[in-house]
Amino acid sequence: MEPYSEDSILALTEKVFKISGYRFQDHELLKTAVTHPSIAAERYASYERLEFLGDAVLGLVVSEMLYTLFPDDSEGLLTKKRIALVRGSKVVEIAQSLNLGNILLMSKGELTSGGISNNSNLENALEALIGAIYVDGGLESVRHFILQHWKPLATNLADTPLQDAKTALQEWAQGHNFAIPSYRLINKSGLEHAPVFTVEVTVNGQRVHATGCKKKYAEIAAAKLMLEKVTKQNDP
């Protein structure tokens, strides 16, 4: 369809209402929220700025939700749960459940290459939609949308193991545009039947080390320590 005809934007407004439960008042904002950079480069503004905002709004609302749902959890455990809930794969999972790719406006080239099902596109677009709902309707409107989709995931966290610390640290690093963490075995001690491995992990120039009875366990322990360190430094 012609992306920005009067009829098409009304149809788009209805589609977004059906998947989000929110009806946009600002149609220009909605257009921007569903415009992929590939078509924006040709004629229009894209969702990238809204994506930036939506990422922060999602983190805020999920943090608030976890603070309320788990009053006995420590700061460290709440941080782990937040990372598990806002990591890219979870955002993509929700975007897929909403069929969000079907309403995105993108170039023919992007469409032909599978853009509507591309995980990166879906993650970015959902964060942009969150940012747009926040701008158009305020915190209460976007809180309602986020809780509708993230609260069931949060309540299931108690019944499932939290994300492996190495994976969580890697996604944290990538989310901050850092190189992926590197691990180095710096010592092996102990008896032959009971070795102790010491592994150092490096992220953005910062290093910590930890030990374990297996190299794998030492890496996980080091990742956990690093994750606690960097989230305290960089998260509000």
Curated annotation (Swiss-Prot):
The keyword Nuclease applies. GO terms for biological process: mRNA processing; regulation of gene expression; rRNA processing; tRNA processing. It is found in: Cytoplasm. Residues 164-232 form the DRBM domain. Its EC number is 3.1.26.3. One of its GO terms (cellular component) is cytoplasm. Homodimer. Belongs to the ribonuclease III family. This is Ribonuclease 3. The lineage of its organism: Bacteria, Pseudomonadati, Pseudomonadota, Alphaproteobacteria, Rickettsiales.
